[in-house]
A protein has these predicted regions:
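Short, small/polar residue-rich loop motifs at catalytic or cofactor-binding pockets
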Residues: 150, 172, 261-263
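Oxidative protein folding and maturation machinery
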Residues: 1-159
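Thiol/disulfide oxidoreductase modules built on the thioredoxin-like
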Residues: 243-290
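Structural microenvironment flanking redox-active thiols in thiol-disulfide oxidoreductases
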Residues: 188-228, 243-251
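Short acidic-hydrophobic, aromatic-tinged amphipathic segments that line or gate anion-handling sites
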Residues: 235-239, 279
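Short active-site neighborhood of thiol/selenol oxidoreductases, capturing the structured segment around
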Residues: 164-193, 207-209
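Active-site-proximal beta-strand/loop segments in catalytic clefts of secreted hydrolases
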Residues: 178-180, 211-214, 238-240
Length: 299
């Protein structure tokens, strides 16, 4: 059985359907038969030289990178492996590590799915206390900022002490940039973001919001804004009092809600403040904005 499981399906010749070649048929055949003779609850698979590489090949070439497609595959494999004492925790851990910090934007939805449907229902027992804490905290940091969700509320103040609320700023697009004025990478990236804003994004209705994540760095923040000539942005921060009020009330702070673990952290929102994109390069953000701004609007 294990020897049979090693074999990779051989793609058939391209068939002719209704007088036309069906070029996807060989691909579908290989995908549909990729796991023939494999029992996912068989712990012996872990002691073979082929299983992990075959698993990686399958997800790389035969599963769409779209999160919902990944979830269906992961869900099926874990269901089939559930009774395996070794392979089930192996697969759950492998998928967790892969999608906790995914290669492609939006795939962290798979990790959130795993947390909500496996870990939150008792499967944290397979983790040691440190890993359990890491997985739980990471899940809660990602739940609020999934693509398509309304962005978490941001109630801040600007450099003059005037209130700034994300949901009171009408705009076709909003880019929220969380940064540290003393961060070397921020000093490089924010002027580049501003260049794209001036050259392209302002014309399609973009509002830029720069959020200083360190309330104690007032002088450095104001100096940064002036030196980098970011005069067309809205600049704001959360006061120490507001931060303490969140802590006292047991509310998640915006750093957790926006998963800010590095700077700059950038989000692109639509007119309803739903998350369109996050954690991309400036060029990737620009590609998305150009595509979306050229689409006809629906009434």
């Amino acid at each position: 059985m294990l020897f049979s499981a090693m074999k990779r399906p051989v793609a058939p010749a391209v068939p002719i359907v209704n007088g036309k070649p069906d070029s996807l048929a060989p691909y579908r055949f290989v995908k549909n038969h990729f796991w023939d003779d494999v029992l996912f609850n068989d712990d012996r698979l872990l002691r073979t030289p082929f299983f992990e590489s075959k698993l990686d090949e399958y997800f790389k070439y035969y599963v769409s990178a779209e999160p919902d497609s990944l979830i269906e595959e992961v869900k099926y494999m874990l269901l089939m492996a559930k009774t395996g004492k070794e392979i089930y925790p192996y697969l759950l851990t492998k998928f967790t590590n892969k999608y906790m910090a995914p290669e492609f934007m939006g795939q962290d939805k798979v990790f959130v799915y795993l947390f909500e449907n496996f870990y939150a229902k008792g499967d944290t027992v397979i983790l040691n206390p440190a890993s359990r804490k890491t997985v739980t905290e990471r899940a809660y940091s990602l739940m609020a900022n999934q693509l398509g969700l309304p962005a978490p509320a941001l109630d801040l103040v600007d450099s003059l002490g005037k209130a700034v609320s994300l949901y009171n700023l009408p705009a076709t697009y909003t880019m929220v940039v969380f940064y540290d004025p003393n961060c070397g990478h921020c000093k490089e990236e924010l002027p580049r973001l501003d260049s794209f804003y001036r050259a392209k994004w302002k014309a399609v209705g973009m509002t830029m919001i720069g959020v200083n994540i360190y309330d104690a760095e007032q002088a450095a923040w104001k100096k940064f804004v002036v030196e980098k000539n970011l005069k067309n942005w809205i600049h704001a921060y959360q006061t120490k009092a507001a931060k303490e009020a969140d802590e006292k009330a047991g509310r998640a702070n915006y750093r957790q809600l926006y998963d800010i673990y590095k700077t700059p952290t950038v989000y692109l929102l639509d007119k309803d403040k739903r998350i369109i994109a996050k954690q991309l390069t400036i060029e990737q953000f620009d590609d998305i904005i150009q595509v979306k701004s050229k689409k006809p609007t629906t009434q």
